[in-house]
From Swiss-Prot:
Annotated keywords: Cytoplasm, Glycolysis, Lyase, Magnesium, Metal-binding, Secreted
Protein name as catalogued: Enolase
Disulfide bonds: none
Major subcellular site: cytoplasm
Coiled coil: none
Organism: Oceanobacillus iheyensis (strain DSM 14371 / CIP 107618 / JCM 11309 / KCTC 3954 / HTE831)
Function (record text): Catalyzes the reversible conversion of 2-phosphoglycerate (2-PG) into phosphoenolpyruvate (PEP). It is essential for the degradation of carbohydrates via glycolysis.
Compartments (UniProt record): Cytoplasm; Secreted; Cell surface
Cofactor(s) essential for the protein: Mg(2+)
Taxonomic lineage: Bacteria, Bacillati, Bacillota, Bacilli, Bacillales
Amino acid sequence: MPYITDVYAREVLDSRGNPTIEVEIFTESGAFGSAIVPSGASTGEYEAVELRDGDKDRYLGKGVQKAVENVNDLIAPELIGIDVTRQNIIDALMIDLDGTENKGKLGANAILGVSMAAAHAAANYLEVPLYNYLGGFNAKTLPTPMMNILNGGEHADNNVDIQEFMIMPVGAPTFKEALRTGAEIFHALKKVLTSKGYNTAVGDEGGFAPNLGSNEEALQTIVEAIEAAGYKPGEEVKLAMDVAASEIYSDGKYNLKGEGVVRSSEEMVDWYEEMISKYPIISIEDGLDENDWDGFKILTDRLGDKVQLVGDDLFVTNTNKLSKGIDQGIGNSILIKVNQIGTLTETFEAIEMAKRAGYTAVISHRSGETEDVTIADIAVATNAGQIKTGAPSRTDRVAKYNQLLRIEDELAGMGEYGGLASFYNLANK
């Protein structure tokens, strides 16, 4: 039977060498599941709480022993004997046990580790792939990758203000070909950067992290790389940006230190409008500060039918935040990060709410990742159509892409690649 017999957590390391939590769940049937929780660098003000120990003498205060103890001593006893396939009951029990709005008592990292491990154990018990267990027979869409090939902001030690410059191979016929496209452009970009005398060290998410003359130069350089790799910018490959504007916002202004420029909300919108007129940009994430809702309304009214406007810090995978955005006509897409909310049940609720409102959903990694590939299965399970999981570089990023290759093979002719159809709410794409 699929009844839980043991839940065990341990402290492991993420891709930045910081501690995170791994959870294992054992069942009476012998079915087993495990998961490792990711961690972010640029975090939204309203994210669920990632519980850290704060002991400066151990891992610089970033240990997660308290979260581990919460799983082993508080959560585990409550889950023993519960059917592991009852995901909603498991998640609801942990939410009630925590009792706070932001999961600040037990920690979203503790709760999420258990939530994901339970799903893996249930899928193993039923002898089906995780994407099939979570999404049923209709889970078939391979996501368009949003590949971060130039890093800046909090993800790199350079002078580039914008956190991520990405490519999206929208014209590929399959995920396999999309990944090949992205990898070839990534290698072409290295050659372009080298020819210009730029450093080709990589940032947290596997993208290159050179010092550049301006943020626009990043866009120019990527277009050069796309063409050098033999692809057509705008037709086969489009661009995307994660501005992470909350990281450059203070005193009501946006301070782009790398360029020595300070802009108002409307001036930022003006700049985005100029950039999308010059470059094939199809998506802008967190273009303004998470609390600058007036600015976001201006951004949405002016550009919402032309580009995908993704809310990350803006919505933090939270249905209350998303509902407010939908009601006010703010943005047209939500970034989905499982550790922003803390359970799979709440994650899926956010995705469903977005779809019902005509918003797109982009499944995302965090800058601190591991070998865990759960988000790849979630992307297919929900038919989200888009996944953001870094450059085709660094094992913690490539692991997700390789899992999607496996899933595409398993689905055989039944799988569909998202491509340009992933942007179903854009009038001009």
